[in-house]
Each structure stands twice: as C-alpha cells, then as structure tokens.
From Swiss-Prot:
The lineage of its organism: Eukaryota, Fungi, Dikarya, Ascomycota, Pezizomycotina. One of its GO terms (cellular component) is extrinsic component of mitochondrial inner membrane. Lyase that catalyzes the C1-decarboxylation of 4-hydroxy-3-methoxy-5-(all-trans-polyprenyl)benzoic acid into 2-methoxy-6-(all-trans-polyprenyl)phenol during ubiquinone biosynthesis. It is an enzyme of class 4 (lyase). It catalyses: a 4-hydroxy-3-methoxy-5-(all-trans-polyprenyl)benzoate + H(+) = a 2-methoxy-6-(all-trans-polyprenyl)phenol + CO2. This is Ubiquinone biosynthesis protein COQ4, mitochondrial. Its EC number is 4.1.1.130. The gene is COQ4. It comes from Pyricularia oryzae (strain 70-15 / ATCC MYA-4617 / FGSC 8958) (Rice blast fungus). It comes from the Eukaryota. GO terms for biological process: ubiquinone biosynthetic process.
Amino acid sequence: MNSSPARAVRALVQSQSRQRPTLERACLSCATVVHARRCFSVLDRPPPNYPGHVPLTRVERAGLAVGSGLWSLLDPRRGDLIAAFAEATATPYFVPRLRDAMLASPTGRRILRDRPRITSSSLDLPRLRSLPQGTVGATYVAWLDREGVTPDTRAHVRYVDDEECAYVLQRYRESHDFYHALTALPVVREGEVALKAFEFANTLLPMTGLATFAAFTLREGERRRFVDTYLPWAVKNGLRAKEIINVYWEEEMETDVVDLRKALGIEPPPDMRDARKRERDARRRRKQLETEAQQGLDAASL
C-alpha cells in the first residue's frame, strides 16, 4: 500500500522534469515578446534593427511628424524635413502596404530579395549616356544632366523600425528621379507638386499628400495651371497606373521610354517647361506693352 503513493510521487517528479524544457522555452518566448513590445524611454532605447536605425518612442514619432510636416510646408526646399516626415508617418500602415504590393508582384519580390541601390556607381552613368535616345537609361541620364542633379543625394532611412519596410521606403526615395524622367516633369516647385500628387495617388504615402498642399504656395498662374491641368492628370494616371514601386529600373535601361509608359499605364503630362516658357513670354510681352503705353502717355503729356 505504501509503494503506491511513492510511485505516484516519482511519476509526478519525472513528469515535471520532462515538461521543464518546454516550460522554459515558453517563458523565454513570452519574455521576448514582452521585451519587443514594451515601451522604452529616450534613456533606455533598444538596439537598432539595421545600420543607421534610430528607434523612436510614440511621443518622439508624433513630435517628429508634426514638426517636420509644418516646417516642410513653410520651406519646401528642406529635403531633410520632408524625408523625416515621410519616415515618421510611413508606419504602421502605408509602407507595409507598399511592401505587400511588392510581395504580390514577381518583380517586386525580386527587388526585395536583391535589394539593389540606385547610385551613380551602381547605374554606371557614362554607359547610360551612350544608350540610344529614347531609352529609359538615356532619358533618365539626360534628365539628370539637364536638371543638374545626381542620384547620390537621397537621405538614408533612419526612423522606420522594420528593416524590410525601411528598404521599401529607401527604394521609393531613390526611384524618385526616375519618376521625373518618366513624366518629364522638371525640378521646380510646380513640377515637384505635380509629381507628388501623382505619387500620392499611386502610393498613398502621407508625405506625398502633404507635399501636394504646397500648391497653395505657387504663384497664381502656376496654381491655376496645376488645378486645371496637372492635378487631374496626376489623379487619373496615379490611380490607374500599376504600382510604380515594382519597376526594376536597373533592368529597364534599354527599354523604350514610351513603351514603359504604356506598360505602366501612364500618359505623359503636357510639357510643363513649354507651358512655363509661354507664360514667361506672355508676361514679358504684357510688361513691354505696358511700358510702351506709359511712354506714350508721358510723351503726350509733354
């Protein structure tokens, strides 16, 4: 009779011993999840998830979004503020949506796997200058030369926590000049606003939507032209075009730019440089006529 309780005790001890590794693993897993989700302070930041990453508290992220957003509206030339606003507002919804769009595309998945970077050295700009006129590469490098810009000026993503999402935003940022070349929109405030409206309709990134409000800072003629011509073009083409984040630009350099536009479903907008030139010429003629009229009045009064 006494041996039965002893056997029961030994069985219980053995059962607990067998379960201990499983319990320890479960506790460790719970601790890891809690640590990953716990709040932290500016004095106790978690380690960065990738080189250059700066983890932010919710308060810091909100402050960065509000501050950079307001100041970038006041001074649209501050690219650093625009970049900070983009990163502060890109998560948790908008960049993950772009990543999911890339994962749904065979080309997008290859981009995420290869993680190419767009720089002067990676693109081999001298080779692009030798490509036939009308190709994507030749159009892109001609646009760079005409506007006096390089692909090496894009800031590195710092405030997006997920490493893959950070790359998606970096890829979007480095592809921006290709969007300019594809649409032939110049690097002037009016051109940037029109392109940002197109990007917002296509990507839904909040930064691109905020940048569209810079239209209120345009001159009257530019603002009227944006509302009448380029905003309708941007909304129509941005919504109907394929996800431009999925273009593997490095593989399209020898593609005819007209064919790529058709493949993406993008119509080129009216030539903004020509429209701005016509406006300047008309303004110059009006000023000349006013001067001549004033000179005529002065001569008649003598």
